[in-house]
């Protein structure tokens, strides 16, 4: 190697006479240009001769391998990323140096790539489907266990970690997403969780949507979800939203989906893209006013469907409709039920008078329905109005005009409210049921106090009191309304 001040190659030394000889050889070709710096940090120059004693400054194995990250030093493979569409705008493809041994030690996919039966010997490997930032995050983790992810890179890093089978980095990505999960991004993250098969993250997204349904469906990401994700959400019994508002949300989604499919936004096309999702809206849970103001005028339902639903709202006996009438109970935990009678007898008649019983509880609960006795004459349909009234204020907190079918046994049959009804501790309420149908079974040997116990919760204590008036004969001792169905 020439030292500073020495003569240039091919030139005579100063003060010496040039002797004749053969012509000088042509100058060597210029060295190839160094690779362009990465947009994510400059690459080190190619080091064919190792830096002397760099190891002495690195006290730990982690420091030594971290020093080799994204470095040409001792590297034996390069990855070419950013080819194809968008590469020119990003300054061309990026070449990232790496070390086969380190990659194979951290990833079964890299191990197979370099050491398996179809191992590659190429010094450059193209990765057209991987983002440079995500790939560098993967390499950084393999070299140093360091995690560098952010809102802009977490999804591509998760994809890359899955592609190269690095579950520890996957877990860090999922943890990052979980910490940043909110109602306004729950649908976006749910779509990604389903795409990347992350059931734990998907479950957390669904829980967030359950608790904050209105905020979640109001976010921009809601209209971007796919039809399968939409149906998965609409099937849930735990959404906390009025059904009329949920219908408005799926109409917005249908309009966006028509545009994605380059279809005219017409009533017919909205119905077409909704498909099964439309049948998952629980129209019977709406009031007749909500139905008339929204779905009936939307043009998405057929005339026959609109007529059948109006009949369902207005006439008795109610015609069957092809829509779910099970309430969406936006409550956590397990459903509970208490029965206030110890024995069942036959023949309880109905003449239009309501069966009533008063009760209090010692803790806050949410009542979702009653269990009622059915016919002594075999399979029968009943029409029924159920209510819960706050006794002192004479305020109706919830009611439902509905029906139920019984099989002639002495069992109870569930009749549910459209929405959960909050019951406060030590406040007196009246449970009311007005039945139309044949004579039924009834309960006897009633209890004034019923205690419900669960391993995970404290005791729920019900106290029962007879209501003033006729009440069709129902009292503490005997009558109808044997069961209260609730959540704590």
Curated annotation (Swiss-Prot):
Annotated region described as Disordered, given as residue ranges: 1-42
Domain BTB: 75-151
Taxonomy, superkingdom: Eukaryota
GO molecular function: cullin family protein binding; identical protein binding
Tissue localization of expression: Strongly expressed in heart and skeletal muscle. Weakly expressed in myoblast C2C12 cells, but strongly up-regulated upon their differentiation into myotubes.
Biased composition regions of type Low complexity, renumbered to the chain: 1-19
Domain BACK: 190-290
Pathway(s) per entry: Protein modification; protein ubiquitination
CDD domains with a match to the protein in the record: BTB_POZ_BTBD1
InterPro entries: BACK, BTB/POZ_dom, PHR, PHR_sf, SKP1/BTB/POZ_sf
Location(s) in or outside the cell: Cytoplasm
Keywords: Cytoplasm, Differentiation, Methylation, Myogenesis, Ubl conjugation pathway
Ranges of Pro residues composition bias in the record: 20-36
GO annotation, biological process: cell differentiation; muscle organ development; protein ubiquitination
A GO CC term assigned to this protein in UniProt: cytosol
Modified residue annotations for Omega-N-methylarginine: 85
Gene3D superfamilies: 1.25.40.420, PHR domain (2.60.120.820), Potassium Channel Kv1.1, Chain A (3.30.710.10)
Quaternary structure and interacting proteins, as annotated: Interacts (via C-terminus) with TOP1. Interacts with TRIM5 isoform Delta. Interacts with CUL3.
Biological function: Probable substrate-specific adapter of an E3 ubiquitin-protein ligase complex which mediates the ubiquitination and subsequent proteasomal degradation of target proteins. Seems to regulate expression levels and/or subnuclear distribution of TOP1, via an unknown mechanism. May play a role in mesenchymal differentiation where it promotes myogenic differentiation and suppresses adipogenesis.
Protein known as: BTB/POZ domain-containing protein 1
Originating species: Mus musculus
Lineage of the species this protein comes from: Eukaryota, Metazoa, Chordata, Craniata, Vertebrata
Gene: Btbd1
């Amino acid at each position: 190697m020439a030292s500073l001040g020495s003569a240039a190659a091919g030139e005579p030394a100063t003060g010496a006479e040039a002797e004749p000889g053969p012509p000088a050889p042509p100058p060597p070709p210029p060295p190839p240009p160094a690779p362009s710096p990465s947009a994510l940090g400059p690459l080190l120059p190619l080091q064919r001769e190792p830096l002397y004693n760099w190891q002495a400054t690195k006290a730990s194995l982690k420091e030594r391998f971290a020093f080799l990250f994204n470095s040409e030093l001792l590297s034996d493979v390069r990855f070419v990323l950013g080819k194809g569409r968008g590469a020119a705008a990003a300054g061309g493809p990026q070449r990232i140096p790496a070390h086969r041994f380190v990659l194979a030690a951290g990833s079964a996919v890299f191990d197979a790539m370099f050491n398996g039966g179809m191992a590659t010997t190429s010094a450059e490997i193209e990765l057209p489907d991987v983002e440079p930032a995500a790939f560098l995050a993967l390499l950084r983790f393999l070299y140093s266990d360091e995690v560098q992810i952010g809102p802009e890179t977490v999804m591509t890093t998760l994809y890359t970690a899955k592609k190269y089978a690095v579950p520890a980095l996957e877990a860090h990505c999922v943890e990052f997403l979980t910490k940043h999960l909110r109602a306004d991004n729950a649908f976006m993250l749910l779509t990604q969780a389903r795409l990347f098969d992350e059931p734990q993250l998907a479950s957390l997204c669904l829980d967030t949507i359950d608790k904050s349904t209105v905020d979640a469906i109001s976010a921009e990401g809601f209209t971007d979800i796919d039809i399968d994700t939409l149906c998965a959400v609409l099937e849930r019994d735990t959404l906390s939203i009025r059904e009329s508002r949920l219908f408005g949300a799926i109409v917005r989604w249908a309009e966006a989906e028509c545009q994605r499919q380059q279809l005219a936004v017409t009533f017919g096309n909205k119905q077409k893209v909704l498909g099964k999702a439309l049948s998952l809206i629980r129209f019977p849970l709406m009031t007749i006013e909500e139905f008339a103001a929204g779905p009936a005028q939307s043009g998405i339902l057929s005339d026959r469907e609109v007529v059948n639903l109006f009949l369902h709202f207005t006439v008795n006996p109610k015609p069957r409709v092809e829509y779910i009438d099970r309430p969406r109970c936006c409550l956590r935990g397990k459903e509970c039920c208490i029965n206030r009678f110890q024995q069942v007898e036959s023949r309880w008649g109905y003449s239009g008078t309501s069966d009533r019983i008063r009760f209090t509880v010692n803790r806050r609960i949410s009542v979702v329905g009653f269990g009622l006795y059915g016919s002594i004459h075999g399979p029968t349909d009943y029409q029924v109005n159920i209510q819960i009234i706050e006794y002192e204020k004479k305020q109706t907190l919830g009611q439902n005009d509905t029906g139920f079918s019984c099989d002639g046994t002495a069992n109870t049959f569930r009749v549910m409210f459209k929405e959960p009804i909050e019951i406060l501790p030590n406040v007196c309420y009246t449970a009311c049921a007005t039945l139309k149908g044949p004579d039924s079974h009834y309960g006897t040997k009633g209890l004034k106090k019923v205690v419900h116990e669960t391993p995970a919760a404290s005791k729920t204590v019900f106290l029962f009191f007879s209501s003033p008036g006729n009440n069709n004969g129902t009292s503490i001792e005997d009558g109808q309304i044997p069961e209260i169905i609730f959540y704590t």
